[in-house]
């Protein structure tokens, strides 16, 4: 939004003829403009891997349905933002690509298929950790295969077990905003 340069969004970057160059240009321009006004953290990139029809809360925000491509483009954004003095925030851990509900309003349950966590959801976040991302934002979704009934934001199994221990992340963890009435599953 003005006075900043507007970009078409991650979905357009991911579908472009030169996604790597566009991701780098987006992050470089964003870092320069944020720095000019004294900002030092961007709540980006979105590292959710699209899994079927993208719902409104993710429309235009995901780099696509290929975990490796999301990881590569996310890494470019992280590297370029942070080289420009802006802390990057990888979000929404451990991934929102399989939900049709807006987790800002209602807590969705994300039912992952066997092996999907490792081969899809964690691929971009593992790359972000390897890239040295400054912060990770958690999602409010519930992942029954990891911690039944507990939103990721409040889950020791997700935050400590998955993010800290399994991925080896030791940086800042922040939560996403939540507008709903209750933080329990199904509410």
Model-predicted regions and their roles:
Residues 2-18, 62-64:
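A charged helix-plus-loop insertion that forms the helical arch/lid used to bind
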Residues 2-5, 40-60, 87, 91-107, ...:
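Active-site-proximal loop/short-helix segments
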Residues 3, 20, 36-38:
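Acidic/His-rich segments in extracytoplasmic proteins that coordinate ligands and/or metal ions
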Residues 15-32, 67-72, 115-118:
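Glycine-rich anion/phosphate-binding loops
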Residues 29-43:
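Acidic-leg catalytic submotif of subtilisin-like serine proteases
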Residues 56-70:
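Active-site cleft segment of glycoside hydrolase catalytic domains centered on the general acid/base Glu
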Residues 68-187:
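Second-shell residues forming the walls of enzyme active-site clefts
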